[in-house]
Amino acid sequence: MEDNLTRIQNIVGKQLGIEPSKVTSGADFGKELGADSLDQVELVMAIEEEFEMEIEDQAAGQIATVQDALDYIEGRWKK
């Protein structure tokens, strides 16, 4: 089974047409990976689907990097 970071890297790679191995944990979706605002919404939706959870709108707006997404997911699972 893939770890959470790998799962997120695969989602980002698929959504943005980037090789997942080139998606680092600190990569900024917009600045470094070229995602526009629609891409970022689609990334959040894909992450929600993959991890079977809902990301609150306020939190979704604060997820700008792979690490932000990972921290949110792992933080939700600890609750």
Located regions from the model:
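Amphipathic alpha-helical interaction surfaces in cytosolic regulatory modules
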Residues: 34-44, 64-66
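C-terminal structural segments of small proteins and small subunits
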Residues: 61-62, 67-78
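Thiotemplate assembly-line natural product biosynthesis machinery
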Residues: 1-21, 74-79
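Generic structural marker for isolated residues within well-ordered, non-membrane alpha-helices
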Residues: 9, 26, 44
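Phosphopantetheine carrier-protein modules
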Residues: 15-34, 50-62
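Residues in well-ordered alpha-helical elements
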Residues: 6, 21, 41, 66-67
